[in-house]
Every structure is written in C-alpha cells, then in structure tokens.
C-alpha cells in the first residue's frame, strides 16, 4: 500500500487514523509536532499518548521540534492581530504554515515518505476535468473541519490523506474501541491549544499585550463604560461587557486608533458586504468576473448565499443576500459550492474597502 507519515496529536481521531491505515497495509510512521515552548497539555500529555499509540500499533514514533515555527506563525501572529483589534484564525494558519507544509517536507527529507495523513474531518478528491485537487466537507457535518483547511495548497492536498472524512465521530469512537486503542475514551479537546496551555485566551494575551484602558461607546459615540484593553474583546461578543443596558449589546467594532470598543444592539449590527484578502483558491484557479456561491464566515456558522466580486490582486468583495451579524476582521471567509470548497481568505477591516 505504500508508506505514510501520520500526524499524531495524542487524541482519538489521529490514533484511529494511524490504526486504520496500519490495518489497511500501509507502512505507517507516527509524527508528533512539538509546538509550544514551556509546559502545556498539548505538548506533554499529547506526546505521551501519541507514543503509547505507536507502541500499541508497533510503529515508529518521531517527535519534530516545531516550536520556532509555532512561535513565529501562531503566537506572534495571534498577538499582533489582537493588538490592532483583529481576531485572528490561528488554526488555518497553523495547518498551512506549521503542520501540513512542514510535515510533508520533513517526512520526505527524513523518512523518504511523500504522503501524510491526519485525523481531520474533511475529504480530498482529484478532479480529472480541471486537473485540480478539491477539498470537500466531511460526511459528518457537525465535525466538518474544511473551514480550517481552506488555506492548504494544491501540493499539500495532493500529498494528504483524510481517512476520517467519510466517517462520523461515533464511528471513529467505535473503531477505537474495537482496536482497543488507549485513547478510545479520551475526552475531546474543546479549546485552542493556546487556551488549553494557558487557561484562557485572556491569560495568554495578557502575557504579551499591555492592558490599556479605554472607552466602550455606542454607535453614536456615547460613552457607556470602560475596558482594560481591546484585545479582551471580539466582534459579536455579548457577555462580559460590564454594561447595564435595557437591551442586549454586542461588540460591533474594535477601534485601535481611538482605543475604543464600539457596541450596538443586534438589529443595528448587520453588514451587507465585506472585503477579503489573501485569497487562496482551491477548486478554481481564480475568477475574473462575479460568481454566486455560499460563504461561511465563522466555524460554527452556516454557509449563506453571496455574490463574489473579484478585486485587484488576491482580494474579493463579498455581497451578502441578507445582512450578516458578527463579520469579524481576521477570521476566514470560506467559499463553498455545495460540499466543495472553492477557496477562502481573511476578512478585512471595513476601512480597507
């Protein structure tokens, strides 16, 4: 069947991925990326569990020191975004810059293996007509992770397997139990690795960003309260504002220049359009005229109809069929045609338009 390097985090999904491929006859080598400097759950407990799985399956286990990459492309990226009122999406950045690309390069250079596999819930297929690899949603829509994978390149898709893409999470757990894997009953991680390692995003950010007090204002500029730093907030946030108001208020803008958090009632917070930068096309080589598609602007939000208008360079304008709430600069806007990912990019500040 050939050789494959499986990315092992120490969780049940990557464990089952290794188990399935091993059972299918692949020569499997486990690879765990050492991501964080200092102590953290994702680096200690996960490494131990990954090593246990490799021992159980009888396959080699390699630990790759990726701490400098993680610091540069994730920690610094997240901090610099929050400093200027942007809410970055570290998972998509990590997949491209820390995990898939570097792991493919390492596996080829160190192991002579040109194919990797991970426990992500998504699917990959090759389109003979277009000559392009396509990324599709997972069969298990609730677990689908295609939103975080939009930024992979054609080369990365060509060298990657997603064995869990056709399965449900329940089936994954069942296979883990049947194989008697040591991670079969391990609880699922609910947070970003940064949060798991530091307790909360606030704790993590406060290590790097100075708390700077400012005003919380409404859309008319009326002062409603005060904050201890705009990096403590994100667009669409309702809880933790510390404001007494007759109606629920939501964060609608983070003004880095004035150091203000702007809030509004939900009915005044909709956006009819936004612009996107750093567009990465997957199913298409790009567009030269407007197209209709669906767009997902947050991981847990549904895809909604949109008109996609090309701008200069790697930028697009998205015009929504209906105004959308919580359009967040720094998050991804991922375009879909049914289950197929057309591509995606990063939402810009409204001022950039």
From Swiss-Prot:
Indicate yes or no for the key word Nucleotidyltransferase: no
Where does it live in the cell? Answer: Cytoplasm
Q: Where does ATP bind?
A: 7-14, 33, 119
Keywords annotated in UniProt: ATP-binding, Cytoplasm, Disulfide bond, Nucleotide-binding, RNA-binding, Transferase, tRNA processing, tRNA-binding
The protein's site described by Interaction with tRNA is found at: 120, 331
Instruction: Quote the cellular component terms of the Gene Ontology held in the record.
Output: cytoplasm
Q: List the disulfide bonds.
A: 94-193
> Where is the region Interaction with tRNA?
143-145, 298-299
- One Pfam annotation reads tRNA_Me_trans_C
Q: What is its EC number?
A: 2.8.1.13
GO molecular function terms attached to this record: ATP binding; tRNA binding; tRNA-uridine 2-sulfurtransferase activity
Supply the HAMAP family for this chain: tRNA_thiouridyl_MnmA
Q: Which family does it belong to?
A: Belongs to the MnmA/TRMU family.
Q: What is this protein called?
A: tRNA-specific 2-thiouridylase MnmA
What species does this protein belong to? Picosynechococcus sp. (strain ATCC 27264 / PCC 7002 / PR-6) (Agmenellum quadruplicatum)
Report which gene this protein is encoded by. mnmA
């Amino acid at each position: 069947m050939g050789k494959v390097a499986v990315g092992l985090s120490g969780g049940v999904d990557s464990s089952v991925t290794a188990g399935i491929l091993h059972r299918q006859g692949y020569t499997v080598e486990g690879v765990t990326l050492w991501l964080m400097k200092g102590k953290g759950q994702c680096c200690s407990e996960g490494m131990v569990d990954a090593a246990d799985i490799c021992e159980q399956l009888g396959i080699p286990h390699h630990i790759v020191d990726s701490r400098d990459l993680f610091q540069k492309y994730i920690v610094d990226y997240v901090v610099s975004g929050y400093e200027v009122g942007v809410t970055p999406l570290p998972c998509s950045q990590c997949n491209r810059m820390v995990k898939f690309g570097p792991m493919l390069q390492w596996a080829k250079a160190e192991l002579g293996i040109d194919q990797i596999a991970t426990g992500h819930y998504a699917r990959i297929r090759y389109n003979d007509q277009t000559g392009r690899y396509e990324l599709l949603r997972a069969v298990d829509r609730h677990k689908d992770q295609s939103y975080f994978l939009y930024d992979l390149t054609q080369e990365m898709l060509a060298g990657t397997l997603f064995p869990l893409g056709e399965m449900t999470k329940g089936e994954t757990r069942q296979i883990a139990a049947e194989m008697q894997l040591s991670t079969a009953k391990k609880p699922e991680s609910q947070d970003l690795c940064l949060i798991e390692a530091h307790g909360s995003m606030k704790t993590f950010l406060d290590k790097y960003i100075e708390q700077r007090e400012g005003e919380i204002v409404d859309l008319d500029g009326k002062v409603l309260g005060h904050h201890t730093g705009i990096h403590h907030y994100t667009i669409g946030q309702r809880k933790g504002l510390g404001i007494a108001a007759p109606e629920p208020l939501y964060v609608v803008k983070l003004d880095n220049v004035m150091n203000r958090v702007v809030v509004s009632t939900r009915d005044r917070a909709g956006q009819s359009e936004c612009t996107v930068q750093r567009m990465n096309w997957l199913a298409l080589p790009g567009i030269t005229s407007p197209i209709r598609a669906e767009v997902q602007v947050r991981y847990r939000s549904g895809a909604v109809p949109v008109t996609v208008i090309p701008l200069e360079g790697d930028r697009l304008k998205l015009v929504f069929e209906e105004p959308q709430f919580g359009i967040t600069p720094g998050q991804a806007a991922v375009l879909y045609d049914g289950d197929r990912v057309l591509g995606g990019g990063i939402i810009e500040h409204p001022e950039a338009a």
